[in-house]
Amino acid sequence: MLKEQPKGTVTVLLGAQWGDEGKGKIVDYLIAKDKVQVVARCQGGNNAGHTVVANGRKYDFHIIPSGIIAEKCFNIIGNGTVVNLDSFFEELDHNKITNIPGWEKRILISDRAHLICDIHMLVDGHSEDRLNINKIGTTKKGIGPTYSSKCFRNGLRVGDLVYDFDGFTLKFRELVKYYQKQYPDLEIDVDLELIKFKKHANKLNELALVADTVITLDELRSSGKTVLVEGANGTMLDIDFGTYPFVTSSNATVGGAITGLGLPPMSIKRVIGVTKAYSTRVGSGPFPTELKNDIGDKLQRIGHEVGVTTGRKRRCGWIDLVLLKRAHLINGFTDIALTKLDVLDTFDVIKAGVAYRLDKELLKSPPSQASDWEKVEVEYRTFKGWNTPILAMRSFNELPENCRIFIEFIEQYVGVPVKWIGVGEEREALILREP
C-alpha cells in the first residue's frame, strides 16, 4: 500500500469574538518561539487590522501576513482573500518592509485572489449610505462588493491583471458599466484606473509576487515546513455564523482556512482561538454584554480600544462566554489565547456573561434573528478583582489568586485550556501556561 509522505503541520489561529482580539501578538509570539516557518492569510482584505509590537517598534498590518517581519518566514496571501493593491504597496512602505533585504522572496499573492477596485469602494459607500439607520457598520473598503463580484462571477482576479492585461482591461470596463447601471451617479476615471493597474501589474511581475499558492503551500509543507494560518476578523463576524447581517463578507471560521488556501482538512492539527479578557466591537451590531456606562468607558480608555483599520472607538463590555463557547463549537479550538488581561487590573468587580434569556426563556444557542438580539438578557457570573499589576508576571502561579480563578472559570465553562495569557502590549508580556 502506498504511504503518503509526512508533511508540515498546519495551525489555524482565529479570532473568537468580533475581531481586534490581539491575534497579531500571538502570531508574532508563535513565529518567534514556536518555529513557525510559513504564515498565510486565507480570507478578508484590508478591512482587518493586526498590530504587532516587535523589534522595538509597532507594525500595523491589514492584508500582509504578520510573518513578513520575521526573516525566516515565508508569507502567503491566499485565494480566499480580496486584495487592494494600493493598500498592499502602501502597507509595505508604511511598515518599512521594503528595507528588509530579500523581503520580496518571502511573500506571494495567489493568482486566484480577487482584486478590490476603486469602483468596489464607491459602491460600498453608496450601499451603506442607502441603509440610513440600518447601517451594517462597513469599513467602506470595498470588501463586500468585491466578494459580491466574485459570487456574481464578474470579479477581477490577480491572475487576470498579471497574466493578461488586455483581457483585464476589457473585464474592468465591463465591471464599471455593470455598477454604473445600478448607481448612475457613480463617477470613476476608467483610463486613470487602468494606468494605475498597469503600474501594479508591472511591479508584481518585476518582483515575481504572484503564483498559484496552492502549489507553493504544498511544496513548503512537503519540505517539512510548519504553517500558521492567520485568520482575520473574528468568529462572530463570520458571514454564516456571525451576528448576521452585521458581519463581514467571508468565512472567518476554520472552514475559511481550508477553502481560502486550498488546504486539506486533515492537515490542520491545532486551532487556536484568541479572545480578550473582555469584549469589544467596532461599528454596529448586536453586543449583549456591552457596557454603555463608566465601566465601558474605563475599559475603552485603559485598553486603548481604537480600531486599527477604522480609527473608530471600540464598544466595550464584559467577556461573553456564551459566544466564546459557541466559537469553540464551530471551530473546535484546541487552545485559547486570552489577551489583554492586564486591562482588568484595577477593576474591583469583573463579570462574565454565562447565559442568554429571550422572553425569560433560557436559550440553548445564540439567536439567528437580528431582531431577537435586541431583546436578549444576559446572566452573569461575578468575580472579585485582583487590583494588582500583572505586567511583569511570567508564570501562571505568579498571578493573583482572583486572577487565576477567573481564568480557570473561563476554560472550565468553554471546555478548552487557556494556554497563552497576555499581560501587556510587548511580545514578551505573555504567559505560556504549561499543561
UniProtKB/Swiss-Prot annotation:
Cofactor mode of binding and number, as noted: Binds 1 Mg(2+) ion per subunit.
Residues the record lists as binding Mg(2+): D20, G49
Binding site for IMP: D20, E21, G22, K23, N47, A48, G49, H50, T139, R153, N233, T248, R312
Catalytic activity: IMP + L-aspartate + GTP = N(6)-(1,2-dicarboxyethyl)-AMP + GDP + phosphate + 2 H(+)
Residues that hold substrate according to the record: V308, T309, T310, G311, R312, K313, R314
Any GO CC annotation of this UniProt entry: cytoplasm
Ligand binding (GTP): 19-25, 49-51, 314, 340-342, 422-424
Keywords assigned by UniProt, alphabetized: Cytoplasm, GTP-binding, Ligase, Magnesium, Metal-binding, Nucleotide-binding, Purine biosynthesis
SUPFAM superfamilies in UniProt: P-loop containing nucleoside triphosphate hydrolases
GO molecular function: adenylosuccinate synthase activity; GTP binding; magnesium ion binding
Disulfide bonds: none
Listed cofactors: Mg(2+)
Active site per database record: D20, H50
Pathway listed: Purine metabolism; AMP biosynthesis via de novo pathway; AMP from IMP: step 1/2
Chief location: cytoplasm
GO biological process, one term: 'de novo' AMP biosynthetic process
Subcellular location field: Cytoplasm
EC number, UniProt record: 6.3.4.4
Subunit structure: Homodimer.
Function: Plays an important role in the de novo pathway and in the salvage pathway of purine nucleotide biosynthesis. Catalyzes the first committed step in the biosynthesis of AMP from IMP.
Family that this chain belongs to: Belongs to the adenylosuccinate synthetase family.
PANTHER family linked to this entry: ADENYLOSUCCINATE SYNTHETASE
Name listed for the protein in its UniProt record: Adenylosuccinate synthetase
Lineage: Eukaryota, Metazoa, Ecdysozoa, Nematoda, Chromadorea
